[in-house]
């Protein structure tokens, strides 16, 4: 059994469970698998570690209502390996007030190398009659943010009040296809290429707006360099 891991193993981890626990503290709240906390500088923090399970609309209303008093919001999707595209879309829909073109998707139409359909527009529509975030937000990413999370980051990156901070995502936006070869090997690959609004391929990852790596000096002091960069950014762009 072997797996190709170079696409994230050759990059900095840029995430630490133990340091994150320091930031969350013992009194953090949890809803639909998301952990959230309000930092002492009045910046809200949500950690979304997976899109595998559904996120309830009522749960999102509750979380965003509680955090509405904050000056800015950090959404951390580092080490989120994806899950359901609909769940990722549901979360992103809370950050726009209008319908936005976020990209294009093609589908395989035949056995040939280039047998794909004409790219079809993908739109993000706001969650109407639901609580939507109106202030600045930052999304934290690393190379282990992939699959449906890559799609989430693409949707968020195009929004005017959202900034991506951290490392390049792991890619893999396209809908996965799984099969087994005659020798018993399992193969899994993206069968539906996805592009951003400028028709740039998303398969190999999305660059952050502001690239930040966690420094070893900070880590020794239980400080998350990427979270601190996000806090600094939100304070300097406070509305």
Segments (PLM) and residue ranges:
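Flexible, low-complexity junctional segments that flank or bridge functional domains
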Residues: 1-107, 115-121, 136, 178-180, ...
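C-terminal cap/linker of serine protease catalytic domains
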Residues: 233-239
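Conserved acidic, small-residue-rich alpha-beta core segments centered on
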Residues: 86-223, 228, 233
